[in-house]
């Protein structure tokens, strides 16, 4: 072998894998299937080191399963629609399509040198008409089955991106991409009926045994099942034909602490009152400026307006309460109306203190009954409290006991009904932008909203659009909107809204099973390949993507595109940590931070210096950010060290669920180790096969232990633990005095065990040592159980708990034989002095204790 040149060997073996078609997947009856998938990337233009870590993890699993006799599907594609492409077009004067496909071309060229065992023949981008045409077909099927509908709704409007955002896309009251403060608007929108599946989506979480508990908890909280009471409050005087207001509450036990009745700014009564009261209308308009998400509403300043209306308390008709419009009340959760109990709800208390409304205790702490000041008393529902003249006769009880008792009492009196509700709301999918999947419906003056015919799909996006002004170019296009009604043939208008990009990623995993099919899926292929056996991606997708995908899988099953078993599409989920890097910062002349590239900083004695000697502040383990100049370019790493070094390091330094900090020193150490393995192979290849050796069994015993430990590590996603065992075995092999045959067996096994992590180096060692075929297709080594037992173990011998001797015995020696050997030692014989021991305790492989 010559000098280790990663560049030369990596290109050679990638070509060999392609030529052999090792990673091309096809149905077969003679192997079990295994589908491994990493969340596909957005084509931003360049891959980053986080991509390398994510896809290397998936590749380790895919290669390992392939070596274990599985028929592996490991595809790759691109989540390609979305605002960044439009923003780039606006900035450059180009076209989103050109920008996107150029970026895909660049990223594929960057990914292939990493040696991922991917079936590139299945690659697609969600902006391919062949893909989004099938997505349009799914939309029509969902529409036919009543899973999608259109209605007027108050939505989150991003005034910068000029589009609607789903609740999940609003973070801290701002658009998730633009960062703009979100506004409320009422628009006609398309919605998926995900709320109809709330109970099923929640209950099925219990079946996902191989999902992280944290992800399941996040989804459960988002779905938000609650049990409460729905009941009516009669208005003292009817208003606009409304005689009573229905309220849903999860804390009916606090009914006697009511301070006011609140209604949403979007409640029908609010809208009716606005029309006749300009002052109220102005105040409500101010309330509607924030977003519609619970988070945005919770963080917003509490705003309210007294309507002048009053209601009668359900338990005391003489007790009248004011009706207020409040900006923190959601129209589409519950009934859009609440009763406020400020003593036991911080939001209500803040509102009441601001508007000088009464605060009434309904219960107090058992040990320290304090009056309510600025902080509401909100104990856990499992905590016992002292009730104050509770109408259902409660004295001391937990919150949950009080809720259950109150619901039963109110139902018995005919005053209300116990109801189960969910927080999960229907998914608004309409977006007012160009670069997305067109919604396949037509608006006809004669027929109304008409679904497009499937034979006319895909409804393609027009190429001749401009982005010189904000808004949706489809609205301004001179001809694209115009079409014939599919029903009556008269002139009609296309829907100009496009689909939320989360639709695109909610079913791509199913499309990978038959990416060229002329229907959304080929059921035979879906029946064979689904479900995804191992899905890998970030925890940040716990609610959005993963919940939507679970809904889509169910909807596709209803429409005949997925089998029953695939209603839960991902059997196992792994959420990986990030790759971080230190930030190097100084302060500029204007007191603003200046961030420096890592290569511009000299590290010395734990400190960092610029070329001119200026010391920089080092912020360790920071999230990589282009704006902070701490992004690691994988292409530069591959050019310098090779793909195998990058793969090895991102797996070796931290458990995969945790963040790992990229350091040049760590990468250099990884490269040094791979060089060492290469040189070790050279040394073993040059050994005299006839020369005697010693310790063959010891070396092979350690080899089989390494097989066991590396296998267990990969099976449990403990890649760093597997690599630690490979380091240790490399050291053992380097020091071994065993004969050539044993060392050759050991180096070839080491190559096999390293092959999922460093596939190129492993292939070269395998070939150099005379391995048959490609290591990527070779069977995974199996540990010999007989070789996992150490030849001899040393056991301490205690007499009455004190160590007096030790014996060396075969590790698998019978307990009776161990006892006899221990009793024959001089120390035990002397202690017994001819008598029999009271007891002998043998702990196999650990210790012998003689009681005299």
Swiss-Prot record:
Matches recorded under InterPro entries: aa-tRNA-synth_I_CS, aa-tRNA-synth_Ia, Leu-tRNA-ligase, Leu_tRNA-synth_edit, M/V/L/I-tRNA-synth_anticd-bd, Methionyl/Leucyl_tRNA_Synth, Rossmann-like_a/b/a_fold, tRNAsynth_Ia_anticodon-bd
Record-level GO BP terms: leucyl-tRNA aminoacylation
Cross-referenced SUPFAM superfamilies: Anticodon-binding domain of a subclass of class I aminoacyl-tRNA synthetases, Nucleotidylyl transferase, ValRS/IleRS/LeuRS editing domain
E.C. number(s) listed in UniProt: 6.1.1.4
Record bears the keyword Aminoacyl-tRNA synthetase: yes
GO molecular function: aminoacyl-tRNA deacylase activity; ATP binding; leucine-tRNA ligase activity
Signal peptide feature range: none
Short sequence motif 'KMSKS' region: positions: 623-627
Alphabetized PROSITE patterns for the sequence: AA_TRNA_LIGASE_I (PS00178)
Motif annotated as 'HIGH' region, chain positions: 41-51
Predominant localisation class: cytoplasm
Pfam families: Anticodon_1 (PF08264), tRNA-synt_1 (PF00133), tRNA-synt_1_2 (PF13603), tRNA-synt_1g (PF09334)
Residue positions binding ATP: 626
Keyword terms of this UniProt record: Aminoacyl-tRNA synthetase, ATP-binding, Cytoplasm, Ligase, Nucleotide-binding, Protein biosynthesis
GO CC term, one of those recorded: cytosol
Catalysed reactions, semicolon-separated: tRNA(Leu) + L-leucine + ATP = L-leucyl-tRNA(Leu) + AMP + diphosphate
Subcellular location(s) of the protein: Cytoplasm
Matches recorded under PANTHER family: LEUCINE--TRNA LIGASE, MITOCHONDRIAL (PTHR43740:SF2), LEUCYL-TRNA SYNTHETASE (PTHR43740)
Family: Belongs to the class-I aminoacyl-tRNA synthetase family.
Listed name of the protein: Leucine--tRNA ligase
Source species: Ruegeria pomeroyi (strain ATCC 700808 / DSM 15171 / DSS-3) (Silicibacter pomeroyi)
Gene name of the encoded protein: leuS
